[in-house]
């Protein structure tokens, strides 16, 4: 029995499902989850010491690769001064200045501890600012596990087959309207049904929680126009795309100006950090200068701020995003070519440092229904064949893959070669 199997058996006795986040349990692919002992660069090492080329990247934060020296040294230095103060620090001011510089739509920013906190707080702020209750989200998009957002959700909720979670009262979600991603007509219909009741739209600019589904050219600008027409706020959830798709996030890549932005993952450099921010007029409604309450004991934690600052400073260096894009394109093109050579129908989507693999006969994947029509069983087979070759992909057909600048072209070619092997086995 491997150490991962032993640890998993022990974990299931004291942790529900043996994991602290459902998608880690391998329910989406079957088998025993890997228990990771350490990581460095583009590689993770399991409890038995086996190395895997990693395309999960802790679900997105590790854009520089694992255990980056700049982040490690920043954290080590910060720890010497204390772990938490519960008071303002220079580091959080420096972080706020850097974030607002990199993301021009954010005049002001508030630090929190997770992406869920960021989206939950941004929606509360939008409701407080507009005086309206209803919100619009999209099928297959995931914005954390706040009650009002677990409606036709993606990510682990979709992997577990529970996009609508038990335990969420109907009264909590009656104000949540769900539209079809990449379908502006469905959004207009929602506004026309409730013309003066919708506080905001919240959207993943690239839907990364139903694998990787980019927006159509008119989708994000269309959402902006509809919000302006009906007096609602546009919240762009950049927890996954922020500082990854482009330095200024997907909003810079697609040239759209949101009222509020939610950040997470990369902003913490691997530490638990989230943030939300936006136009000063809206952010000024937050306590202590406004009536909308939001707080957090560990928000702006000095260790987390040190990690996040170091990460953003490195990500801001010239060439980082060009490298990410080149590596991701090389991988996507190589995987698609090998699939076609093997006669296996597949669609590969990619934007910046994100990619998604879909086993489908369709020519494109642009919405939740397209994703649900893909062959999940074939993905499971592909996942385990790649794992056999020590390539670690997300253990779910509904999660995006992530590139880092620590990946080399040799790593990419090794992955393509492994896929060729996997496709040959799948064809047989």
UniProtKB/Swiss-Prot annotation:
Reaction(s) this enzyme catalyzes, per UniProt: (S)-4-amino-5-oxopentanoate = 5-aminolevulinate
Residue positions, PTM N6-(pyridoxal phosphate)lysine: 265
Enzyme Commission number(s) from the entry: 5.4.3.8
GO molecular function annotation: glutamate-1-semialdehyde 2,1-aminomutase activity; pyridoxal phosphate binding; transaminase activity
GO terms for biological process, alphabetical: protoporphyrinogen IX biosynthetic process
Places the protein is found: Cytoplasm
UniProtKB keywords: Cytoplasm, Isomerase, Porphyrin biosynthesis, Pyridoxal phosphate
Predominant location: cytoplasm
GO CC terms of this entry: cytoplasm
Pathway: Porphyrin-containing compound metabolism; protoporphyrin-IX biosynthesis; 5-aminolevulinate from L-glutamyl-tRNA(Glu): step 2/2
InterPro entries noted in UniProt: 4pyrrol_synth_GluAld_NH2Trfase, Aminotrans_3, Aminotrans_3_PPA_site, PyrdxlP-dep_Trfase, PyrdxlP-dep_Trfase_major, PyrdxlP-dep_Trfase_small
Name the UniProt record assigns to this protein: Glutamate-1-semialdehyde 2,1-aminomutase
Organism, scientific name: Proteus mirabilis (strain HI4320)
Gene coding for it: hemL
């Amino acid at each position: 029995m491997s150490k991962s199997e032993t640890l998993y058996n022990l974990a299931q006795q004291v942790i529900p499902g043996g994991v602290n986040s459902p998608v880690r349990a391998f329910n989406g692919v079957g088998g025993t989850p890997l228990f990771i002992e350490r990581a460095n660069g583009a590689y993770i090492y399991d409890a038995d010491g086996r190395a895997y080329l990693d395309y999960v990247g802790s679900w997105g934060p590790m854009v520089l690769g694992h255990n980056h020296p700049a982040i490690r040294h920043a954290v080590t230095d910060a720890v010497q001064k204390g772990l938490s103060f519960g008071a303002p620090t220079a580091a959080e001011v420096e972080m706020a200045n850097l974030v607002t510089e990199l993301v021009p739509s954010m005049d002001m920013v508030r630090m929190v501890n997770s992406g869920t906190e960021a989206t939950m707080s941004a929606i509360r702020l939008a409701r407080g600012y507009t005086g309206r209750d209803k919100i619009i989200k999209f099928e297959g998009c995931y914005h954390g596990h706040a009650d009002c957002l677990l409606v036709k959700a993606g990510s682990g909720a979709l992997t577990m087959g529970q996009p609508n979670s038990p335990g969420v009262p109907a009264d909590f979600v009656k104000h949540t309207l769900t539209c079809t991603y990449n379908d502006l007509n469905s959004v207009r219909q929602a506004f026309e049904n409730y013309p003066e009741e919708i506080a905001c739209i919240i959207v993943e600019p690239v839907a990364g929680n139903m694998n990787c589904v980019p927006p159509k050219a008119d989708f994000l600008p269309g959402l902006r126009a509809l919000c302006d027409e009906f007096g609602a706020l546009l919240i762009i959830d950049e927890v996954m795309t922020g500082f990854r798709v482009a330095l200024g996030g997907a909003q810079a890549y697609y040239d759209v100006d949101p009222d509020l932005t939610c950040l997470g993952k990369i902003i913490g450099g691997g530490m638990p950090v989230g943030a939300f921010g936006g136009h000063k007029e809206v952010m000024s409604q937050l306590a202590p200068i406004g009536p909308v309450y939001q707080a957090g004991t560990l928000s702006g934690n000095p260790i987390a701020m040190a990690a996040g600052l170091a990460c953003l400073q490195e990500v801001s260096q010239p060439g980082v995003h060009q490298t990410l894009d080149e590596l991701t394109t090389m991988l996507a093109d190589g995987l698609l070519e090998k699939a076609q050579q093997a006669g296996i129908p597949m669609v590969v989507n990619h934007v910046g440092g994100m990619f998604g693999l879909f086993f489908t006969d369709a020519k494109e994947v642009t919405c939740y229904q397209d994703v649900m029509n893909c062959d999940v069983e074939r993905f499971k087979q592909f996942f385990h064949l790649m794992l056999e070759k020590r390539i670690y992909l997300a253990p779910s057909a509904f999660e995006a893959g992530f590139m880092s600048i620590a990946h080399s072209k040799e790593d990419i070619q090794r992955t393509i070669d492994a896929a060729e092997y996997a496709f040959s086995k799948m064809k047989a």
